[in-house]
UniProtKB/Swiss-Prot annotation:
Originating organism: Saccharophagus degradans (strain 2-40 / ATCC 43961 / DSM 17024)
Gene Ontology cellular-component terms listed: large ribosomal subunit
Biased composition (Basic residues): 7-16
Biological classification of the source: Bacteria, Pseudomonadati, Pseudomonadota, Gammaproteobacteria, Cellvibrionales
Region (Disordered): 1-43
Hydrolase keyword on record: no
Protein name stated in the entry: Large ribosomal subunit protein bL32
GO molecular function, one term: structural constituent of ribosome
Record InterPro entries: Ribosomal_bL32, Ribosomal_bL32_bact, Ribosomal_zn-bd
Length: 60
């Protein structure tokens, strides 16, 4: 098993963890439907940049 040779300081631990923060996904609001969606992705209704690009079938 690997065992550290020297104890790492709080500063070194913090510097290592400085890049581990999570970021939320950037959401946009569609201009036509007002629905939130991921950037550069089609909305679940089939709209992209305010235009209907995909015909979505109803599952009901």
């Amino acid at each position: 098993m690997a065992v550290q040779q020297n104890r790492k300081t709080r500063s070194r631990r913090g510097m290592r963890r400085s890049h581990d923060a999570l970021t939320g996904k950037t959401l946009s609001v569609d201009s036509t439907t007002g629905e939130k969606h991921l950037r550069h992705h089609v909305t679940p209704d089939g709209f992209y940049k305010g235009r209907k690009v995909v015909d979505v079938a109803d599952d009901e």
